[in-house]
Curated annotation (Swiss-Prot):
Subunit structure: Heterotrimer of A, B and C subunits.
Keyword Magnesium annotated: no
Reaction catalyzed: L-glutamyl-tRNA(Gln) + L-glutamine + ATP + H2O = L-glutaminyl-tRNA(Gln) + L-glutamate + ADP + phosphate + H(+); L-aspartyl-tRNA(Asn) + L-glutamine + ATP + H2O = L-asparaginyl-tRNA(Asn) + L-glutamate + ADP + phosphate + 2 H(+)
Organism, scientific name: Carboxydothermus hydrogenoformans (strain ATCC BAA-161 / DSM 6008 / Z-2901)
Descriptive protein name: Aspartyl/glutamyl-tRNA(Asn/Gln) amidotransferase subunit C
EC number of this enzyme: 6.3.5.-
Gene from which this protein is expressed: gatC
GO molecular function annotations of the record: asparaginyl-tRNA synthase (glutamine-hydrolyzing) activity; ATP binding; glutaminyl-tRNA synthase (glutamine-hydrolyzing) activity
Family note: Belongs to the GatC family.
Reported function: Allows the formation of correctly charged Asn-tRNA(Asn) or Gln-tRNA(Gln) through the transamidation of misacylated Asp-tRNA(Asn) or Glu-tRNA(Gln) in organisms which lack either or both of asparaginyl-tRNA or glutaminyl-tRNA synthetases. The reaction takes place in the presence of glutamine and ATP through an activated phospho-Asp-tRNA(Asn) or phospho-Glu-tRNA(Gln).
Xref: PANTHER family: GLUTAMYL-TRNA(GLN) AMIDOTRANSFERASE SUBUNIT C, MITOCHONDRIAL
Enzyme class: ligase
GO biological process terms held by the UniProt record: glutaminyl-tRNAGln biosynthesis via transamidation; regulation of translational fidelity; translation
Length: 94
């Protein structure tokens, strides 16, 4: 698989990026270099390699939940431009 100049131009258009001709050429070359490296990785023999999610043996470390003093609702809402009961009122965005 290779990346063409047209592919780079299409992605730049989707991302709303204005790229110079030199940048388009540079990104095309860099992306193709990355793909060539990924193809080299595909050639590795992984037949006897055990599948892992992480190279180090890691387990989740959880902490105990502790109750802490919290901010009083009146203080939290003191500088709110608008509020409704004990909630911040914000403009509808959808």
């Amino acid at each position: 698989m290779t990346i063409s100049l047209k592919d780079v131009e299409h992605v730049a258009m989707l991302a709303r990026l204005k790229l110079s001709d030199e940048e388009k050429e540079m990104y095309t070359k860099q992306l193709n270099d990355i793909l060539k490296y990924a193809e080299q990785l595909q050639e590795l023999d992984t037949e006897n390699v055990k599948p892992t999610a992480h190279v180090l043996p890691i387990k989740n470390v959880f902490r105990e939940d502790k109750v802490h003093q919290h901010l009083d609702p009146e203080k939290a809402l003191a500088n709110a431009p608008e509020r409704e009961e004990n909630f911040f009122k914000v403009p509808k965005i959808i």
